[in-house]
């Protein structure tokens, strides 16, 4: 017998077909072909029904921009990778995974936006990295440190916490705060400079024209700058020209700088030669899976960056960034600020010998001011001309070797160079007097 719903089947429409030596399945398939109806056989009955067609909305047809989030989960004290830790996106817990034998994880097809990423593992406190920006232009790499969780057998309490006061340096107990480049980029009028961001903290006073900061009333020139654990000269363009301890623009581009520590109080014993505060900055590692390049043009300069793997199998990578000022192009004359800077980092992890890295930072600053026309002289400054030349270099070779779960050795061989030269002339009606 044949069963159907009369309201959904046009019984007035007739079909004439001829079959010979065919099965009932082939006959019904030919009969209902392109009619919008389907059938199914139950026992001795054939049931005919209207085909269920699901309409796709326009929003589902729209292809969303997605990107990949990669990273590593490590122990905050020993920096050793944590295997098989669970990683997920808090806004969508279904998107996530677990780390491999080297602590690496990968989450694919994440729509662009900002996300909070959580890592959890037995014996550790859940760790959350907040406000991770995902863009379509490049992969996101996140390092998630986790603290061991001491458990009482009578009671177990696991509580996720977002610790803004946790520093990159595990030896810092108090007086420090981690500054992420994400925070610096969102700070109004901050020029992506961690020093300008720090002026918003308690006990820190900033300057409008420079990135000089006075910490707890101490002079800005007593602030110590560190890069990859090595003390370096102030990595700021035109430093100390308008005021001691400050400069115009950070020489470290947002393309290369990673999470850094800022100390405005008591700091660990490893930081010496500092009376005010400490900026302990770090260069991030390049992408060891794919090549990525960036080109930025702004009012202050041109920024070129490139990163990618050196050897994918061994996990080695490179990262390089170069900036060149465009103020001379914008002004069209010789009274301007000219600067260049170059930063790079090469990372070479090994299975038995530890991790080797080579890094460097260099900056060149030039500033020339010509004297005004004689008819425009009103003050001593109008009669003056000057030329400033600043060159700074810093670089090193670093090695990190993990002895066991609680101990690792980090050693560095580095060199720094700094040279400042200033010339000033005073023009009179009869002569030019060199005053500096």
Language model feature labels by segment:
Residues 1-59, 95-98:
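N-terminal export/assembly leaders
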Residues 35, 41-90, 120-125, 135-187, ...:
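Short, acidic, small-residue-rich periplasmic hinge/interaction motif at the N-terminus
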Residues 92-104:
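Short, acidic Ser/Thr/Gly-rich low-complexity loop/linker segments typical of extracellular
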Residues 125, 131-143, 157-267, 278-284:
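Periplasmic N-terminal accessory/gating domains of Gram-negative outer-membrane beta-barrel systems
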Residues 246-250, 258-268, 277-308, 320-337:
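Short strand-turn segments of transmembrane beta-barrel domains in outer membranes
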Residues 290-292, 330-334, 378-385, 394-398, ...:
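Extracellular loop and loop/strand-boundary signature of outer-membrane beta-barrel proteins
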Residues 298-324, 334-367, 386-415:
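Transmembrane beta-barrel wall of Gram-negative outer-membrane proteins
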Residues 330-335, 363, 368-377, 413-416, ...:
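Outer-membrane beta-barrel translocator domains and adjoining extracellular loop/strand segments
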């Amino acid at each position: 017998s044949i069963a159907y719903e009369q309201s959904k089947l046009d019984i007035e429409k007739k079909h004439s077909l001829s079959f010979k030596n065919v099965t009932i399945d082939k006959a019904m398939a030919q009969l209902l072909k392109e009619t919008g109806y389907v059938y199914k056989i139950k026992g001795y009955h054939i049931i005919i029904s209207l085909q269920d067609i699901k309409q796709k909305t326009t929003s589902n047809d729209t292809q969303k921009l997605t990107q990949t989030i990669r990273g590593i989960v490590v122990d905050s004290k020993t920096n050793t990778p944590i295997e098989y830790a669970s990683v997920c996106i808090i806004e969508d817990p279904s998107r996530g995974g677990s780390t491999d034998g080297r602590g690496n994880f990968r989450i694919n097809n994440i729509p662009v936006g900002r996300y909070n990423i959580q890592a959890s593992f037995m014996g550790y406190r859940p760790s959350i990295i907040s406000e991770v920006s995902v863009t379509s232009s490049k992969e996101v790499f996140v390092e998630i440190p986790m603290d061991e969780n001491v458990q009482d057998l009578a009671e177990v309490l696991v509580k996720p916490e977002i610790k803004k006061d946790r520093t990159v340096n595990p030896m810092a107990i108090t007086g420090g705060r981690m500054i992420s480049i994400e925070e610096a980029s969102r700070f109004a009028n901050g020029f992506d400079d961690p020093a300008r961001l720090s002026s918003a903290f308690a006990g820190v006073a900033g300057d409008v024209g420079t990135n000089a900061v006075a910490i707890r009333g101490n002079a800005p020139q007593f602030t110590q700058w560190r890069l990859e654990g090595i003390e370096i000269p102030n990595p700021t363009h035109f430093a100390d020209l308008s005021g001691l301890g400050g400069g115009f623009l950070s020489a470290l581009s947002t393309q290369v700088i990673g999470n850094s520590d800022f100390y405005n109080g008591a700091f660990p014993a490893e930081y010496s030669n500092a009376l005010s505060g400490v900026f302990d900055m770090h260069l991030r590692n390049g992408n060891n899976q794919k090549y990525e390049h960036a080109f930025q043009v702004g009012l202050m300069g041109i920024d070129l960056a490139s990163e990618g793997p050196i050897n994918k199998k061994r996990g080695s990578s490179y990262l390089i960034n170069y900036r060149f000022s465009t103020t001379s192009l914008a002004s069209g004359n010789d009274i301007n600020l000219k600067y260049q800077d170059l930063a790079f980092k090469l990372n070479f992890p090994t299975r038995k010998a530890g991790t080797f890295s080579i890094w460097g930072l260099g900056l060149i600053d030039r500033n020339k001011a010509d004297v005004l026309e004689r008819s425009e002289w009103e003050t001593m400054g109008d009669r003056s001309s000057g030329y400033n030349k600043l060159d700074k270099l810093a670089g090193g070779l670093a090695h990190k070797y993990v002895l066991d779960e609680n101990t690792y050795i980090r050693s560095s061989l580095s060199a720094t160079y700094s040279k400042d030269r200033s010339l000033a002339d005073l023009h009179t009606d009869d002569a030019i007097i060199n005053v500096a």
